[in-house]
Amino acid sequence: MSETNINQGQINKAVWRACDTFRGTVDPSIYKDYVLTMLFVKYLSDVWQDHWDAYQKEHGDHPDLIRELMKNERFVLPPAANFYSLYEHRHEPGNGERIDKALHAIEEENIQKLSDVFQDISFNSNKLGDEKQKNEILKALLEDFHKPELNLRPSRIGRLDIIGNAYEYLIAQFAATSGKKAGEFYTPAEVSELIAELMAPAEGDEICDPACGSGSLLLKCANQIKNAHNGSKRFALYGQEAIGSTWALAKMNMFLHGVDNHRIEWGDTLRNPKLLEDKGRLRLFDVVVANPPFSLDKWGHEGAGDDPYGRYRRGIPPKTKGDYAFIL
């Protein structure tokens, strides 16, 4: 087994073990967002620290130069707004408030990429229990992500795909424990792969998923192009997701897979489509894939006859069959 495979398995197991902190006290449908967000923050922090150390070896006597170079990073982390600062203060009261402040600072520093991504999650929420329980849970979570197996520095793990794969692994595990609710944020990998193979997206394609969930299906389409064209990134991914917390998962999923050429919008595709041309017309795409919510009975039937975008020219779907609204 290669080092890459060993690392992938270790990382998958380690991030799943981090969930033990919540089990028995917080519902999985709630704590999944906390674990996935912490994985994202840990990755950003490890990349930042890795690159800082590399610059320090090269320009050790010029700290101002290092700070200037770090401004060009893919994601910029403000002072104290990183995993390691949070970990150092884990024994003190106020873990939830500190994490929330760090997320806000990271978002503000990277506003074009991360605008609103953390607005639906609060580590200071009473969903995690009273102040004492919450502080203990978050202390344990920080300690779980500080373990050697979750050293996510590029100099250690190599390919970014390993982190993206771990994120997808977590989403799949949460889906397996969520029953019917899993359909709100996840399409099984086997189904996604089959759809992507059948659609056979080509290099240069613009690909859309109007009910994108956590973005897994879009990423499978991206992988089809990468695998067929020596890792090519000549494609663009578009999506829209109605549930705010799931939209945030999709955004983080894209970044953890190194897919920055994406546009994922938050909103109800049927009632309020966001993927529009400059003149307000619906944008057209080379490939459209979806696993839409089935049998929606409140999808906007009452306004479909006056749809400003000219949809439903072939007829208006039944009031209780909103899935047809995605294909007519």
Q: Each predicted region: which residue ranges?
A:
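A short glycine-rich, Lys/Arg-flanked "PGG" loop and its adjoining helix->strand segment in the class I
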Residues: 328
